[in-house]
């Protein structure tokens, strides 16, 4: 699948899937450009449908400067539009991570950030990199 470029100003309300719009992937620094991997949208839609609950993207695409500001890796998949940090309403992040791993058994990144890792509800990082990567903070 392809990585597509969108404009926050022009494409904000564009529906990418039944549950996701372009604006949900925006960089939190307010930049107009948003990169989004079509495969990431498919992955997130599968997670949404499996749990039957809203999926909140807490971090999607990041510019290099914003990635540095938030302490992201220099090789972060967020820079390419291939990653999202997510929370599924009323769902344990470890259950979300386990399901994401089942969707990508030999590829993709899944990071587990349980409740103790800083955000009250914890979160899960998912990305569509071609190789397999798993970690827990």
Task: Spell out what each predicted region is.
Residues 75, 79-84, 88-137:
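Catalytic cores and adjacent binding grooves of peptidoglycan-active enzymes
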Residues 12, 20, 65, 70, ...:
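Solvent-exposed, flexible loop/coil residues
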Residues 41-71:
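Extended, low-complexity, intrinsically disordered C-terminal regulatory tails
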Residues 36-43, 53, 66, 82, ...:
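Amphipathic alpha-helical interface surfaces
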Residues 35-37, 62-67, 88-90, 101-104:
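A short linear-motif detector with a strong N-terminal bias
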Residues 1-50, 119, 130-137:
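Extracytoplasmic cell-surface/polysaccharide-interacting catalytic and binding patches
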Residues 28-30, 55-61, 96-99:
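N-terminal start-of-chain detector that recognizes signal peptides
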